Amino acid sequence: MNTRSTFLASTLSVILLVLPVVSSAKPPKPTEEAKLQAKLFQKKLSKDEQVLHALDRLTFGPLPGDVERVKRIGLKKWIFEQLHPDRMTENPGLEAQLQVLESLRMTPLETLQHYPGPQMIRAIANGKQPMPDDLLLRASIERLITRYKVKQAEAAGLAAPPKDANADLEPVRTLEQILTPGELDTIRKGNPEQKRQLLESMQQDRLEDMLIAMNQKQRTQLFGAAPSPIRREIFLLNSPQQVVAYDLLDSKMLRAVESTRQLAEELDDFWFNHFNVFYEKGADRFLIPQYEREAIRPHVLGQFRDLLEATAKSPAMLFFLDNFESVRPDIDLNDTKRKVKRGLNENYGRELMELHTLGVNGGYTQKDVTEVARCFTGWGIQEPRKGGGFFYNDKLHDKGQKVVLGHVIAAGGGMEDGEQVLDILARHPSTAHFISKELAQRFVADNPPEQLVNKMAQTFLATNGSIREVMKTMLDSKEFWSEGAYRAKMKSPFEMVASSARALNANVIDGWALANQVGTLGEPLYRKLEPTGYSNLGTEWINSSALLERMNFALQLAQNHVESVKVDVSRFGDDPNAVAKILMFRSMSPQTRAAIDKALEDSKQKNAAMVAALVIGSPDFQKR
């Protein structure tokens, strides 16, 4: 049996062994063992367990040295730091990596101009937009224009344009003219590290000439070995809009793995899912970077009312839930100079109450949904497909009287009608309870004690929705520091991948490949179609198929088979329990230890990488 077959066989045996253990590790349903669970939430953790619990819940998993640091400065001081991220010094290495990701700092209009989508490509092809000056972008657009014209010709039943119809498309020089024979051999036959060294050594003009001379397949084959800046150039040549997606994925993984402001990153993920928008929906491809940068990240520990308004006025949300097209029902279409029929759209009004504030059982009716939708008519985007910002059009607003949850909003109002709705919802007791429960489900347990949720909700109402104060109430509670919460949640794919990289102290050169792994495990980042966002319930992420993928990921990571992620497992040795104490800061359960011992015995591959992979893929590591 060859090495590849042996590897696959050992992987399968491991998964078959750990599946029963993971299944038994699922927490009981709410109706089961209720008395036992209530007692567990009364039992206090030891001091050492409290440190591990804080690092498991308030970070994407501990780095080597984190436990010692928390013990040294004290748990209270460490929590205070995490609750005040603006006072912390960020990891300078992370900041340097993020600096390369230019689209994250651009306005939507700048993003469109630098990384155009199909609409702008067509505009340039038809002479309505100028060709950009940037050499790589120009080459990409010329290629895309040719593809567009070929499709046009095919649709019209005409002959395709001749190859020289766009002379600029043809490479000025071939690869043989640009590269030396040795360089050509490295590009075609070298291993990833040899290719990376060559790419990093090339001057920028030669590098650009080479990438332009390559076809799309050749550039794609080079992608795995390319460092981050060159990967972005490859994306730019293949499809400019891919750069924006690349930057989003790269930054999200880098921040989760490397940021010192771990709680802020946890909350960024929480709030983005709470106010979810879908990357693949039209203009949201270039609106999301601004959305996360300006509507989500500044408010993760701020006032909920500010966060609510920031998302309500964000072009990304207005576009995703179609509110930019919502107008008063009696609108005179001739006044708007539009041929497309428009009317009242209730999507945002419904999701605002059901998902963003009150919750599905929050006490609203269908009549309230309609009234809220009327209040937000006229809230739109200035030229949405051209990167415009929030724009209120009074001509499209319904000026009649509305009644929302028993509150009368007088006739004759304007944009303030929607703002009044946000006020009503932000201070509503149902919102306080719903938000508190969602936070408790993320950070405490899938079924958090109602007593804790009520305490958090009281703080929410007393502080006008201070997220920081609600989090402090949770962190000051006996329930958070109890056996009922300790290792009671299962990691989402995002948490599993990030915590694995952190536990192994991985050198993440580029977060894109890790983000792809998250997608493979079932949580493609920024691509949740439904406005619900991804679930906070850990039990929803565990099934046999998902566990197989998690074990495969662990094996790839530990054996350095994940692109642009380097780990050193030589320090671990091959004793599973010793490795578990390094990676999890605790011993394995007897069931997991027995399963791993059996897997190692059967596979005959007992080495540091295999042992580390089995620990990371084990049910014990899936818990947090």
Language-model features: where?
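Bacterial N-terminal signal peptides that target proteins for export
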Residues: M1-T11
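Bacterial N-terminal signal peptides
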Residues: S10-P20
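Sec/Tat signal peptide C-region and signal peptidase I cleavage site
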Residues: V21-A25
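Flexible, low-complexity segments enriched for small/polar residues
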Residues: K26-K39, K43-K47, L52, D56-D66, ...
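Active-site substrate-binding loop specific to GH73 endo-beta-N-acetylglucosaminidase modules
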Residues: K26-Q37, E176-G182, T186-K195, L199-Q242, ...
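N-terminal accessory alpha/beta regions
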Residues: P64-F270, H274, Y279-Q290, A295-R297, ...
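Alpha-helical scaffolds flanking conserved acidic
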Residues: E266-L267, R305-D306, E469-V470, A608-V611
